[in-house]
């Protein structure tokens, strides 16, 4: 097992006693470095563990209960390059071994941004899906806004890592509508089909550039999250200023159609929010979202449980905000009045403190009701309470400029006994761990969280007894 790092992170920050006591997982990204390091850090800015990577991150890593991480990364030569480009996904053990690795960077698919680990061990993957200009025209698309003569659409693939098989897949191409060619199968009145996406909505990439040159990005899906209670998926589209909910209970056949699954709607949108002008039930004044990221459900049992929360990058006057809102859930579907847009008309909670970032950004509710917020371009993470008071913060610093796409904070008991009791992180519990813990307690040093075996917030003889019992089996 790797050596346990108890080092002060190069950071600026402060701590309030009301901050949630947890472990923050993050991977700084740098345009100057092709490799990267993932850190697991406590509230005192001490590294508890690190993982090293040969390639930089596409988004944030995910910590699993066995101590492994799922890490989406950037491949050197992607087949389509735009913001958030990735191409690779790997599972890395606590010890740093690569347990499996897959790349989705070919003439059909290019992974980008986020992934989502599922309870069954599978992984949901966001990909661009290549379509020729002619294929787009044949579906009713009127213009292609780039010189590449292609349109990279959107798909979600469910990977079964043990076999390498794609066991479920959703393609937006199966769920489009257009009102320009009545001879095509997807012809319809846009406002009568909020469950479908107007194929002529928005531009397809650009002909300019920046360092990545022209691209053919249409939807720019930048986040994905899964709700195991509902068996539903939510995704976020930066360019369309909307979030969408899909039914994951569908079979492989149902997901490509318009019926089936728990919702009875197949792979069509169950719900969408943020920009009703996209489906003809509003105008620019009705738009709430602008280039948003980090859509996710607040877990059941947390304050706001069942609501959705996101980071709205350009909320007002080029400043950002975190929004929490309650979707109008109705069984396995979502209520909507005929001719009107999906509700709600506004949010339930908003944080508009001194935050702004033009790219990525994160927002996650914590068990105690606080919210963890990532300001990407300054590599800054803050924790605020429900009143908007800032309780904890840090900024990652180093020899080069860093970003942090997003990060999450995990409870101290999330890893079970993986950290607890292993005082020297040598991969085994033995008498040496007892000696180290006893000496630290005698010295009044509680800096190593592995010593708090009963998670009562203190380290004393009870923790030594628990450690002895663990060693004796």
Model-found features: residue ranges?
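Sec-dependent N-terminal signal peptides
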Residues: 3-15
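Short, functionally important structural connectors and interaction interfaces within domains
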Residues: 4-7, 94, 162, 265, ...
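Cellulosome-associated attachment modules in secreted, modular CAZymes
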Residues: 416-473
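Histidine-/acidic-rich catalytic cores in large beta-rich domains
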Residues: 16-418
